Amino acid sequence: TSTGYHNVFLGANAGDLNTTGDNNIVIGYNADASSNSADNEIVIGNTSHTNARVYGLRTPVTATTADTTLTANDSGETFVFNDTAATFTLPDSGAGDITGVYFHFIVLDDTAGTKRIQCADSTNEDLIGSVRSVDTDTSDATASFASQVSDEFHQITFDGTTTGRAGSKVTVTNIAADKWHVEGTILCTGSPATPFS
């Protein structure tokens, strides 16, 4: 390294091609960043990790009152519906490069209104999986609602009553290009109804 700063190179010949790159972590024999001037990269062996997660630390919880478009960098976070109406738009998974990205959603606001999770591409992207619904104004009777590939559903709506109210939690995981898996438990009042559409 001739002028690069704050780099960590561990292993024989690790980072030996770096000249001006800053803030890189390179581990392993002959491992190098993507270029001699790359910044902010983590390379273990010959694999570059653009988003590293340190296990054992807390993940962020974000309360939201407005429409929000998520990115792959938000993966692992918990998002809380903290208002009558808000829409979370998932990142577009059409390129197939965000497999494994996941988000947790919790409804905290208990008023009627449209709280929604939706795919970025409503034509090509689909939600598959199921949720269990618990009717909170009877004996906690349960019902299940499934979303199959053939259904071509692309959004989940919590309406504050029959399709989800405060206490509902859903996890959405990208499993392939244009495919998101959904699992969770929703609380409802009245006659349980599917949150998928």
What role is predicted for each listed range?
Residues 6, 23, 40, 50, ...:
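The right-handed parallel beta-helix/beta-solenoid scaffold, focusing on the short coil/turn
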Residues 56-144, 148, 173-197:
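Exposed extracellular interaction/assembly regions and N-terminal maturation sites
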